[in-house]
Amino acid sequence: MSTFVQKPAEVEKKWVIIDAEGLVVGRLATVIATYLRGKHKVTYTPHVDDGDNVIVINAEKVVLTGKKYTDKTYYWHTGYPGGIKERTARQIIEGRFPERVLEKAVERMIPRGPLGRRQMKNLRVYAGSAHPHEAQQPVALDVAKLNSKNVRSA
């Protein structure tokens, strides 16, 4: 018996929707990264984009554990001398684009390369509960029920 190898033409992508309200960022990001890469399928092939399309709503209501909300710092560089910039997770979540905290967490769990960039395009993150993907009939995935530690109890 030979090893199964998925061909790009045989890939069947589904649409999955996840409500991120009250979920821990890192634990949610691992589930999303698994679905984007297709590792939850028995047909997983490392060099083929056979992951699903993932829609995340309520990204502004994600939770960070410990003191990460105030202490976690995101850095980037403008490209100019002395152009290092930084923002805390709190500043980003309370700012204009709160979904970027979750996007960065997932992006850093996906391999960096052409395949990883293609897989990241299958992720759609929305700060609120509205999304324009009703026509795709996404299947709801309840991440909170997968493990009790996925939800942060107050």
UniProtKB/Swiss-Prot annotation:
> What keywords tag this UniProt record?
Ribonucleoprotein, Ribosomal protein
Q: Name one GO biological process term.
A: negative regulation of translation
Note whether Ribonucleoprotein occurs among the keywords: yes
**Any one cellular-component term (Gene Ontology):** cytosolic large ribosomal subunit
Q: Name one GO molecular function term.
A: mRNA binding
Concerning its family, UniProt says: Belongs to the universal ribosomal protein uL13 family.
User: Quaternary form?
Assistant: Part of the 50S ribosomal subunit.
What's this protein's function?
A: This protein is one of the early assembly proteins of the 50S ribosomal subunit, although it is not seen to bind rRNA by itself. It is important during the early stages of 50S assembly.
Q: What is this protein called?
A: Large ribosomal subunit protein uL13
What is the scientific name of the source organism?
Allorhizobium ampelinum (strain ATCC BAA-846 / DSM 112012 / S4)
